Regions:
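Membrane-inserting effector segments that mediate pore formation, membrane fusion
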Residues: 77-100
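Terminal export/targeting leaders at protein ends
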Residues: 1-85
Length: 100
């Protein structure tokens, strides 16, 4: 999938922002950018992105939210809400940082 912001690593950019600023950016993300983040999350869940035991332990805390985030029937607004939830984005970003 082509990046919605050519030349910009969205995950790395969001990871560097403060929590408040990240929430503001996630709130105005385009549909394509949101799909990119959701796809990365799905790849972590499916095991396509190798994760260490400590990363999996961190993700396990957010299991229900991760499954809802990657669900086909989850609305765009709900996905944005889930990504802003405490710790969820950081757990996913930490798991995909070596690949993305």
């Amino acid at each position: 999938m082509a990046s919605p912001l050519p030349g910009v690593n969205l995950m790395a950019l969001l990871k560097q922002l403060s929590d408040a600023l990240r929430a503001d950016v996630i709130e105005v993300l385009s549909k394509e950018a949101l799909e990119e983040l959701t796809e990365a999350t799905l790849n972590v869940i499916l095991g396509n992105i190798p994760s260490s035991p400590e990363q999996l332990r961190s993700l396990r805390r957010h299991k229900q939210d991760l499954l809802e985030l990657t669900g086909a029937k989850t609305s765009e607004a709900r996905r944005k809400e889930l990504l802003q939830k405490g710790g969820l984005f950081r757990s996913v970003a930490h798991a995909v940082e070596n690949v993305w």
